[in-house]
Regions:
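Short beta-strand/loop segments at the ligand-binding rim of alpha/beta enzyme cores
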Residues: 54-60, 102-111, 149-158, 196-205
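Conserved N-terminal beta1-alpha1 strand-loop-helix module at the mouth
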Residues: 44-98, 105, 114-116, 131
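Conserved, mostly hydrophobic/aromatic
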Residues: 73, 139, 217
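Glycine-rich phosphate-binding active-site loops on the catalytic face of alpha/beta enzymes
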Residues: 84, 207-213, 220-235
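Active-site-adjacent beta->alpha loops and helix N-cap segments on the catalytic face
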Residues: 86-99, 115-120, 137-151, 160-166, ...
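Cysteine-centered motifs
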Residues: 3-4
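Catalytic beta/alpha-barrel core
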Residues: 61-65, 81-88, 109-115, 132-138, ...
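Short, acidic/polar
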Residues: 64-74, 163-170, 210
Length: 235
């Protein structure tokens, strides 16, 4: 472990000099060491290997806000995971299907789908009527229902003040999401603190718009970054 840590620490000094493909290879070395630590710290709780393997191949997650975004991300072979941030009760099935047809993991942000309620039944609707792999939500009750339905779950959390740290700590124990997405994702020191205190893998999202932001979040300990920026998707 010490050797792996020393290697990645040296690599991080000049990560911005590497291409994204080279960074992804270095990132995998780092993830091997971190995965071992997580396996011990999660007290026997198994990590979600399917999702985890996808972000190990490419830690950049495409967050799509409209049909143009959807078309672009589906055409990018390197993108493995897609966060769906738009849609309505009539269109969400087709949106998810396009992502699945392109061979990607489809995660629906259920809070942002028009025409659906904020109650647990919305998760049942997504599970029954789409081929979505999982859900994203800021609501603990919906995350809990997603886990009951054997879906991947991402609890989205906005870091507004210092109370957020304790709230995240409580939520991870009470709800046990598979992943926690923290926003904004451009605060590496804060991301690092959350990663150290959390037994749940962290995704950094929000305002990720360039290579420097991506590298800073990953170096701080995030398992992946989510971004709506097309240039970030193509790195």
């Amino acid at each position: 472990m010490r050797c792996c840590t020393e290697y990645t620490d040296r690599a991080e000094v000049s990560l911005l000099d590497y291409t994204m493909s080279q960074v992804q290879r270095l990132y995998k070395v780092y993830r091997v060491g971190r995965s071992i630590l997580l396996d011990h710290s999660m007290r026997g709780e198994k990590m979600n290997s399917f999702f985890h393997e996808a972000v190990e191949e490419n830690p950049i997650i495409a967050a799509v806000k409209n049909m143009d975004d959807l078309k672009i991300c589906c055409s990018l072979e390197d993108i493995r995971v897609v966060f769906i941030l738009f849609g309505d009760v009539c269109s969400i099935r087709e949106i998810v299907q396009q992502i699945k047809d392109s061979g990607k993991v489809a995660m629906v942000h259920v809070d942002l789908i028009s025409g659906l309620s904020s109650k647990e039944i919305v998760v049942d609707f997504i599970r029954k009527n789409t081929e979505a792999d999982g859900i994203i939500s800021t609501k603990a009750a919906l995350i809990k229902r997603g886990k009951e339905l054997k879906m991947f779950t991402v609890l989205r959390y906005f870091l507004l003040d210092s109370m957020a740290y304790e709230n995240i700590r409580q939520q991870q124990h009470a709800v046990k999401p598979d992943y926690i997405e923290v926003l904004p994702g451009v605060m590496p020191k804060v991301i690092g603190k959350v990663c150290k205190m959390s037994k749940t893998s962290i995704i950094a999202g929000g305002l990720i718009s360039d290579k420097e932001s991506v590298m800073a979040a990953l170096s701080a300990g995030a398992i992946a970054v989510s971004s709506t920026n097309h240039e970030v998707w193509k790195m």
